[in-house]
Design a protein with these regions (language model features):
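Short proline/glycine- and polar residue-rich coil/turn motifs
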Residues: 104-111, 226-235
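Surface-exposed binding patches on compact interaction domains or structured appendages
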Residues: 31-38, 62-116, 207, 214-219
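Short, acidic/polar linear motifs in exposed loop/turn regions
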Residues: 60-63, 82, 122, 197-202, ...
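Bacterial N-terminal signal peptides that target proteins for export
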Residues: 2-17
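Ligand-binding face of N-terminal immunoglobulin V-set domains in extracellular IgSF glycoproteins
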Residues: 52-56, 100-105, 110-122, 127-132
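Terminal connector regions
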Residues: 72-74, 119-166, 245-276
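Beta-sheet-dominated interaction scaffolds and their linkers
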Residues: 30-65, 101-105, 174-193, 226
Length: 276
């Protein structure tokens, strides 16, 4: 693989990792104790320009292990459901992606840098390329299939970490509009939520928090759900009560008064509301 070229990354939160267990029957050959950073990539570029990036794969286990790496397509619905697709989906940009290798050997309690490149063809239209890099631990019997390119998401795996990659081409950006803030009933419990529309051509997210006080005088923060709002979507996102120490706050007593600012990449929304 050639040396990666510089990239331009949009602001993002501190990197964390998510372990998604995906056992589908059978016994586990070994614990899947892997961490990956960053948790996602938010990049910008243009057609005809190669972008290089790297992630760190950390083995937290006291024994050496091997993981496999591949790309997958994904979709996040307006209702908040994520789906993964091994087959190329319409408009997929995965053919633009070159991975350093199919598998990585990790030493006990050690780390490896893993490189990948994205090369959008010249003349690619403005928009957002989205895919995930899947780092998987698998049963030994499945290693040959994966390395031979014959793996599918239906194979039993001991674990998977999926790292989202977003590439905004030729200035693609979100355009968010906060349409509503209200209290609603969900699963028999009251919650506070905001409805946000994205009329842009790249994904967006809400950040920031609101200061809130309930009818019993208890103060807490309301923090927006940090999941993506894809282009063309209108999503209702929960505002989660959070205590000063960062832990979940008790269920508030209504009415609740809330004020403050919710931020997104290109702006912010000033909020002042009484929620019954």
């Amino acid at each position: 693989m050639t040396q990666p070229s510089p990239t331009h990354a949009l602001p993002r939160r501190t990197a964390t990792f998510i372990l998604l267990l995906a056992g589908a029957g059978g016994t586990l050959a070994a614990p899947f104790e892997i961490a990956v950073s960053p948790s996602r990539f938010e990049l910008s570029g243009r057609g005809g320009t190669r972008l290089g990036q790297s992630l760190e794969i950390h083995n937290l286990a006291p024994v050496a292990t091997e993981v496999t790496v591949r790309t997958i397509d994904w979709h996040y619905s307006a209702e908040g459901q994520i789906s993964y697709h091994d087959d190329l989906q319409p408009g997929s940009c995965r053919p633009w992606v070159a991975l350093e290798r199919r598998s990585v050997q990790l030493p006990a309690r050690g780390s490896r840098a893993y490189r990948f490149q994205i090369e959008p063809p010249a003349g690619s239209p403005r928009g957002e390329c989205r895919f995930m890099i899947a780092i998987e631990g698998s049963e030994p019997a499945q290693q040959a299939l994966i390395q031979g390119g014959g793996a599918s998401l239906s194979l039993p795996v001991t674990g998977r970490i999926a790292v989202a990659v977003y590439l905004a081409l030729d200035g693609a950006e979100p355009r968010l509009d906060l349409q509503r803030i209200a209290s609603t009933d969900s699963g028999g419990q009251r919650r506070i939520a905001v409805t946000v529309a994205n009329t842009g051509d790249a994904h967006g997210r809400l950040e920031g928090s609101l200061e809130a006080v309930d009818s019993q005088g208890r103060a807490f923060a309301l923090v927006p759900e940090g999941t993506p709002i894809l282009p063309g979507q209108t999503r209702t996102l929960a505002l989660m009560p959070q205590a000063e120490d960062g832990r979940a706050a008790p269920q508030p007593a209504y009415p609740v008064k809330a004020e403050g600012t919710l931020d997104w990449a290109q702006g912010s929304f000033k909020v002042e509301a009484t929620l019954e």
